[in-house]
């Protein structure tokens, strides 16, 4: 652990903070759990899986600290944990999926610094040190991942254009029959 575990967002590596708030890593594990065992394709920033007529496309833009071991104590602070990454641009991706022609429902779930990150929401609130029930409730209610639903009519292929900010994971679930998509 980098910071004491006795305060809000103390820096521990767990999936929940000391008050039970779900960290971004928790939601990322939920996304990973939606992937099927049948891997169709994978690359540096994506993995595509399939289960029957359902497809799962996981896109990710991760970053690693600059000189992590050498500079960690001097760079990393309680409220400025991202400084050690430097300036990393967004990642634009265009994925072409060869799918059977038909009507599809897509569910896109994003975990990033602006969606699904209780820590980043807390920073946006001014990093209040007093962890009142009101503050904790607000963070719990507002820090879940954004979910977008879209419909698409496919003729041979589906084009997915996505821009990923650094530290983001996007899961796009694609189902030919909308009524059998899993609820998470």
Can you say where each PLM-predicted feature lies in the sequence?
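C-terminal beta-sandwich/jelly-roll accessory domains of carbohydrate-active enzymes
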Residues: 60-184
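Aromatic/acidic polysaccharide-binding cleft in carbohydrate-active enzymes
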Residues: 1-77
């Amino acid at each position: 652990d980098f910071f004491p575990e006795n305060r809000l967002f103390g820096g521990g590596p767990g999936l929940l903070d000391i008050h039970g708030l779900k960290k971004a890593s928790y939601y990322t594990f939920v996304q990973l759990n939606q992937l099927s065992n049948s891997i169709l394709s994978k690359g540096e920033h994506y993995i595509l899986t399939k289960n029957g007529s359902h497809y799962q496309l996981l896109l990710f833009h991760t970053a690693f600290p600059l000189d992590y071991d050498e500079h960690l104590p001097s760079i990393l602070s309680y409220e400025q944990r991202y400084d050690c990454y430097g300036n990393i641009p967004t990642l634009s991706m265009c994925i072409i999926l060869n799918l059977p022609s038909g009507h599809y429902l897509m569910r896109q779930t994003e975990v990033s610094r602006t969606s699904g990150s209780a820590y980043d929401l807390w920073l946006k609130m001014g990093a209040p040190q007093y962890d009142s029930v009101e503050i904790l409730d607000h963070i719990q209610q507002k820090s879940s991942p954004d979910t977008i639903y879209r419909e698409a009519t496919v003729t041979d292929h589906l084009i997915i254009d996505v821009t990923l900010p650094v530290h983001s994971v996007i899961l796009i679930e694609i189902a030919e029959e909308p009524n059998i998509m899993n609820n998470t």
